[in-house]
UniProtKB/Swiss-Prot annotation:
Belongs to the universal ribosomal protein uS10 family. GO terms for cellular component: ribonucleoprotein complex; ribosome. Part of the 30S ribosomal subunit. GO terms for biological process: translation. The keyword Transmembrane does not apply. The keyword Cytoplasm does not apply. Keywords: Ribonucleoprotein, Ribosomal protein. This is Small ribosomal subunit protein uS10. Transmembrane segments: none annotated. PANTHER family: 30S RIBOSOMAL PROTEIN S10 FAMILY MEMBER (PTHR11700).
Amino acid sequence: MSNQNIRIKLKAFDHRLIDKSALEIVETAKRTGASVRGPIPLPTKKERFTVLTSPHVNKKARDQYELRTYVRLMDVISPTDKTVDALMKLDLAAGVDVAIKLN
């Protein structure tokens, strides 16, 4: 696997959780002898919702909500077999979505 790279993309709603998970991945990869590029913070996606609080009248009474999605990107350069095994066994937090691609 010396000529392949692993691209890891993390998504979460909590920035503290995603940064902690990214740090765990970087430490695991470096401990097994691979080099890591990142974590690179990608732009935060903000979804805004406006909801009427009154069921019938009072158009001016509204609540506004925002949902932020944080994304981090990492490249593991020249991973070894130990690196792949360690990354597969790694237990990350429940609120983090992990997507892995081989380049």
